[in-house]
Amino acid sequence: MKWLCSVGVAVSLALQPALAEDLFGNHPLTPEARDAFVTDLLKKMTVDEKIGQLRLISVGPDNPKEAIREMIKDGQVGAIFNTVTRQDIRKMQDQVMELSRLKIPLFFAYDVVHGQRTVFPISLGLASSFNLDAVKTVGRVSAYEAADDGLNMTWAPMVDVSRDPRWGRASEGFGEDTYLTATMGKTMVEAMQGKSPADRYSVMTSVKHFAAYGAVEGGKEYNTVDMSPQRLFNDYMPPYKAGLDAGSGAVMVALNSLNGTPATSDSWLLKDVLRDQWGFKGITVSDHGAIKELIKHGTASDPEDAVRVALKSGINMSMSDEYYSKYLPGLVKSGKVTMAELDDAARHVLNVKYDMGLFNDPYSHLGPKDSDPADTNAESRLHRKEAREVARESLVLLKNRLDTLPLKKSGTIAVVGPLADSKRDVMGSWSAAGVADQSVTVLTGIKSAVGDNAKVVYAKGANVTDDKDIVTFLNQYEEAVKVDARTPKEMLDEAVNAAKQSHVVVAVVGEAQGMAHEASSRTDITIPQSQRDLIAALKATGKPLVLVLMNGRPLALVKEDQQADAILETWFAGTEGGNAIADVLFGDYNPSGKLPMSFPRSVGQIPVYYSHLNTGRPYNADKPNKYTSRYFDEANGPLYPFGYGLSYTTFKVSDVKMSAPTLKRDGKVTASVEVTNSGKREGATVIQMYVQDVTASMSRPVKQLRGFEKVNLKPGETRTVSFPIDVNALKFWNQQMKYDAEPGKFNVFIGVDSARVNKAEFELQ
């Protein structure tokens, strides 16, 4: 794989503008050398130059270049985001070297969340793989392509635990589970940063959004978060800490308030927890325009007050506003912000630039000018093989009645639906520098898979939505939803005619990518009515109906589950999505994905998640009782539980065996099962291990994921899968906010999803 190759690019500094001899050199990338270097550099800087380092601005095609040139000349910019080509980045770094007094390099950042030019499945899809090797692949390829474009940092990974699918940004995260999110976030940081973010094909990560952004009330974007410290530290904080412990150089601070205090002005969060308790040494970055929003939050009286509060609370870099540059000079002059506080913020920024290797070579991620690609979007710059492999693993088979899947590569296949041939939507939101024309749609993938062996007929069938208000809202800044010029009846009739002449119908339905994005919260998480009408009409033809879902959140699918013969959850699968989906539909790849979020039966169940507390009156489906924790108009559990996903083969999991009945605090026990492929096809499944603290000083979840392993087995093959358990897997923040494990009985559950498990037990001494 080209991204694993050791590419020795000798950067000829002779081709770049002259560098300051006393600033640039072969500096050791050690904390001691960095601290001495930055201390000396700070002594040479004016107040305005220090403030300039704290400013992070967006530079896109619409920005006035001359104004930016003057800001760079005057040292008023510390970093730039949203510039994504080597040529454009080089111009601005050249301006620093040619025009500014101290020649302090800029760093360049972008939202490389699930790929740069090659777009991988959205993070929720990647989480469905339950495969850390897939995460590593996405991280390394994304970093390679980002660095190859001249970028130094990415605003990723997003590790906000979310249990509310109404929230549009659930698509960016790894789901509802703390352990899974922490494990995947940690792995992504390690993969993207490599041995060092200074390496030619690595980038520095920025864990986001600190903190608890995924818990906004009602799933409504930018809303408030209010929760107990126990819930915060047990369920929401571990993924951030895991990413920082893995070495992430930056943290993006959330836009929400937490227990009444905006995260942007929360010194307890940014200093007491982040710096003092966790020992974080990198930079904190405000989210877009967050400092000025403190006024609307009601925690700052005016712009100057907002800047004072933000800086003193621990915000190092201000993203996309002019508040720091406008108001910090006066605040420092008046003494309302001390020079020590300004120096501390500037030091953090200079530290990460040092760690990026920019003071050794400000062009380290650019190379010599004559190496710039002639075509930034050249096909040769993509990593299609890796994208297809990862996309396959992200797909989750939700239903397969009477072995409807895999399909035969013969006969006539109707491919219908508003998302079946959408190059933009298959990429998902936050698709970075990906080019829609380079993505493979489901229709294209199916045609490629069957070749001349089958006839494929296509009909759009419906718009994603016919709700004019929703279309207007989603298309406010860009065309996120396309509306066909034909009437709904004309499109529906075309789809029905296509279905009637076919042996099987594949309907690609769900959400446009813009419906599962920032500022895209929903109160209704069913498939839009226009598409529900299409599904009903297709069902009425009597032809076998396969639903291919394309969406960025769990959807309420009770009706569709009744109508469809098979359902394949594909999320937004990326550049190679169409080929990967076709691989699964026709059996060239046996699906192995598992759900990282529970699928509710209706929006009224939200939040529904597997690791809930038992309550004093738990509902028992075998012995239903009115006076238990339940709804009277809806079944209690989700439609599809966390960890769920089918295969084209079957698996048998044995009883759980414990290596010992007791666990000492300085030891470990091992829980093991025998897993057998009891079907007729080779396939993989994810064996999941959950733990329950039966009796504790405070109520604990009914089960919590503490390990998983994907195993591939041939028909009849059996393998032992073992999970070590130590005291760290049992610790929690108790009522006194002490992090510890309490002696007593623990249950261990192992199975193929969170509902179908076998149980054993042990005791912690």
Question: Which stretches of residues belong to each language-model region?
Answer:
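Glycoside hydrolase catalytic-domain context in secreted enzymes
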Residues: 20-734, 740-754, 761-763
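Short glycine/proline-enriched turn or capping motifs at secondary-structure junctions
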Residues: 3, 755-758
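Gram-negative bacterial Sec-dependent N-terminal signal peptides
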Residues: 1-19
